[in-house]
Amino acid sequence: MFFHKKRNVNGFLLLDKPKGMTSNNVLQKVKIIFKAKKAGYIGTLDPLATGILPICFGEATKFSNYLNASDKHYNVIARLGEKTSTSDSDGIIVRKRPILFTPIQLSLALKALTGSVNQIPSMYSAVKYKGIPLYKYARQGINVKRNIRCVFIYKIDLVDQKDNWIELNVHCSKGTYIRTLIEDLGEKLFCGAHVIRLRRLKIGLLSYSKLVKLSFLENLLNEKNVVKINFFKKIDDLLMPVDTPVYFLPKIYISIEKLSVFRLGQKVNFSSSITNGLVRVFEKDNNTFIGLGKINSEKTLIPYRLVSMLTN
């Protein structure tokens, strides 16, 4: 048996969520493997879905909201002619209709679902009502009135469509429900539709090229491997930097002299071409991430969101 006290893990992991697990179940497994004191995930994926599930450890959780607000990219395969209770293949079929649309009608339907779109979250979603996820009400047969959400669909690419299935690539804003999008498409085509496969490919500029599979982590935890390798070094090497969620912000360096004052929450003078904006602040000598600062028009750097000392 492998035992270890909980650690102060700091970093960011791009996990490839497996099918059939909730996002929270995946998080708890990863947290146990890393023996991490603090961890969270960004952007809930349905049990049926796979793909990018960002995991933030320790100090990285302070910046998760920036990545959560980013655009998302999905690949989805849907079955046409059938509407289900959950808008995906996990539910029961509630209605069947013939598939009679033409290529032109499909093109028009996809165009109508592009741009600013109003969606009503599915009852089988993680949206909370009075602190309880909607899917828990749905399982008890309780229907809750949901507020309309306005989302933005930047692009829908038709990958393929044959017989009773269709494959799409979707680029959308935060908060978009792909199941709802597919169900709405089915209604516009007068045949119904539900998701049978969903994979998240990208969040912001972070793509699946750096994904780590849960099965890979579990294999490393195998008792024989734990004995043979420096286990924690191996898994910690998979982590991306703490500032990954704010990678899009400009990067600046401050001297160690100014750093001592800055860490105490005091503003420091800083000459820069950047004005009135957030920046990533690094210590000049060793390239250590300090946190976020805000530069104003008076060439002053003000502490905005700082990290604690990054030690394990």
Swiss-Prot record:
Pfam families: TruB-C_2, TruB_C_2, TruB_N. Keywords: Isomerase, tRNA processing. GO terms for biological process: mRNA pseudouridine synthesis; tRNA pseudouridine synthesis. Transmembrane segments: none annotated. Substrate binds at residues 74, 177, 198. It comes from the Bacteria. The active site is at residue 46. The keyword Isomerase applies. It is an enzyme of class 5 (isomerase). GO terms for molecular function: RNA binding; tRNA pseudouridine(55) synthase activity. It catalyses: uridine(55) in tRNA = pseudouridine(55) in tRNA. Its EC number is 5.4.99.25. PANTHER family: PSEUDOURIDYLATE SYNTHASE TRUB1, TRNA-PSEUDOURIDINE SYNTHASE. Responsible for synthesis of pseudouridine from uracil-55 in the psi GC loop of transfer RNAs. Belongs to the pseudouridine synthase TruB family. Type 1 subfamily. This is tRNA pseudouridine synthase B. It comes from Buchnera aphidicola subsp. Schizaphis graminum (strain Sg). The lineage of its organism: Bacteria, Pseudomonadati, Pseudomonadota, Gammaproteobacteria, Enterobacterales. The gene is truB.
